[in-house]
Amino acid sequence: MQVSLMANFIELKEATTNPDYGCPPAERDIEAHISMGVVNLDKPSGPTSHQVDSWVRDMLHVEKVGHGGTLDPKVTGVLPLGIDRATRVMQLLLEAPKEYVCLMRVHREVDEERIREVLGEFQGKIFQIPPLKSAVKRDLRVRTIYRVDILEVDGQDVLFRIACEAGTYVRKYCHDVGEALGAGAHMAELRRTAVGPFTEEGLVTLHDLKDAYQFWVEDGDETFLRECILPMEFAVGHLPRVVILDSAVDAICHGADLARGGIAGLDDNIAWGDTVAIMTLKGELVGVGEASMSALDIAAADGGLVIETRKVFMEPGTYPRMWR
């Protein structure tokens, strides 16, 4: 079994994988690596996220590039990009938790202790109405603020890190904090520092990506390009895993739901209704599904369908058909 077994991984049966089919993500040839790759891009201030997509598409001479989680033009930081076949994987990041570093400007002097007190109150579940310039309907919604860390207070400037549920508007968050302070406040600067498994560690600039591509094209050196472009499997690192047998792969590729007998192992933190990444024994992403029961219930089940397949990313025929 070629999947690394972490402490929270339940191995249901000993299994081996046939080396004649599929390919471990790290061993894909460079063309496949690019067309099934993702980039942890450091978006600069200025362009829209769609403009960045277009630049990278032209830079790499590929057909499609898409991003996971739009950033406003002036916002910098983590912008995950999917290339060609990996563009659909970006959809899985839309609901992933996000993290930002924000510079909030309070409109008049307020005691620092009061600022800390109010920001402490704006954690957990909060109510938000999207701002006027948002692309969604302006209905009252509940969002979860997982953590707020104040990094620095300098007069009317408050620098803080916020970890929040997808769909949280940090600009509106600053406005609401300002209202609670009785002084007013606005978001002066914003940088995204994490989207699901994508963090500031390993960020790639547009210049890095262009240089890496040129090294490969002109010198045949793909080392730097492989560092800049990651396997698409990286993009599901925030999801719990279900690892399946070779014999189950092609059925999933054709849209079948996953039966208990096709599972080699799974993470023990899976709850009913969770979105899970369906992986091969070689660590390839087959698709994603919705758990019909918890990990412990799956492990105890005698058989039956346990994962409803929602999206398929692997091409049918990658593994041999072993189903009727």
Curated annotation (Swiss-Prot):
Reaction(s) catalysed by this chain's protein: uridine(55) in tRNA = pseudouridine(55) in tRNA
Secretion signal span: none
- Name the cystine pairs: none
Sorted UniProt keywords: Isomerase, tRNA processing
Q: Where are the transmembrane segments?
A: none
Q: Which GO terms of the molecular function aspect are on file?
A: RNA binding; tRNA pseudouridine(55) synthase activity
Instruction: Specify the PUA domain's residue ranges.
Output: 239-314
Q: What is its EC number?
A: 5.4.99.25
Annotated SMART domains: DKCLD, PUA
According to its UniProt entry, one GO biological process term is: rRNA pseudouridine synthesis
Protein family according to the UniProt entry: Belongs to the pseudouridine synthase TruB family. Type 2 subfamily.
Described by its record, this protein's role is as follows: Could be responsible for synthesis of pseudouridine from uracil-55 in the psi GC loop of transfer RNAs.
Entry protein name? Probable tRNA pseudouridine synthase B
The major lineage groups are:
Archaea, Methanobacteriati, Methanobacteriota, Methanomada group, Methanobacteria
